[in-house]
UniProtKB/Swiss-Prot annotation:
PANTHER family documented for this protein: FMN-DEPENDENT NADH-AZOREDUCTASE 1, FMN-DEPENDENT NADH:QUINONE OXIDOREDUCTASE
Function description: Quinone reductase that provides resistance to thiol-specific stress caused by electrophilic quinones. Also exhibits azoreductase activity. Catalyzes the reductive cleavage of the azo bond in aromatic azo compounds to the corresponding amines.
GO MF annotation list: electron transfer activity; FMN binding; oxidoreductase activity, acting on NAD(P)H as acceptor; oxidoreductase activity, acting on NAD(P)H, quinone or similar compound as acceptor
Keyword entries, A-Z: Flavoprotein, FMN, NAD, Oxidoreductase
Protein name: FMN-dependent NADH:quinone oxidoreductase
Amino acid sequence: MKILHIDSGILGEHSVSRRLTSAIVSQLKADRPDAEITYRDLASERVPHLTGAQIMAPADLEGVDALLAADVRIGRQMLEEFLAADTVVVGAPMYNFSIPSQLKAWIDRLAVAGKTFRYTEAGPEGLAKGKKLIVASTRGGHYSVAPASAMDHQETYLRSVFGFFGITDIEFIRAEGLNLGPDQKQFAIAEAEKTIAEGNVLKLAS
């Protein structure tokens, strides 16, 4: 089993999404001691945003300047890591109703025709079928119910884009209302960690 562990929160040791992804991966690792884990910290690593020059770069990168070539290689490596994974664990805090820009930059590197999707006469087809996606979703407010749910462009986007890649087994471990006071924050984190500790993530990745 290969696990790809992605963090994108910018708050370091204060990040709740990081705390939750760590717990998820630890639970998976305890159940599958032989699991191979690849880790990327998108907040501390350089994750180049997609540019036209990168898209137009020749496959062999001949004649391409060093910085552009490095950016293209980073994107290719990220794609290969994703394709190789059986289970993908993503820490996705909600920032301004959406996801961190560095997480979007990573997803842009995965959205490659012929790799994660293709267009057919019957419409688009996802090529990353069979993977499990577990998302540690953290929010300052409550966005899982109306009327605030209309402003959720975080979980809805992630479900849509990874569904487009062919991944239908998607679960969100959610901690929300984190900015509504210390008691609510503690409660939300405890509930999320309880869900993880009860072994639900193992069922997801079985």
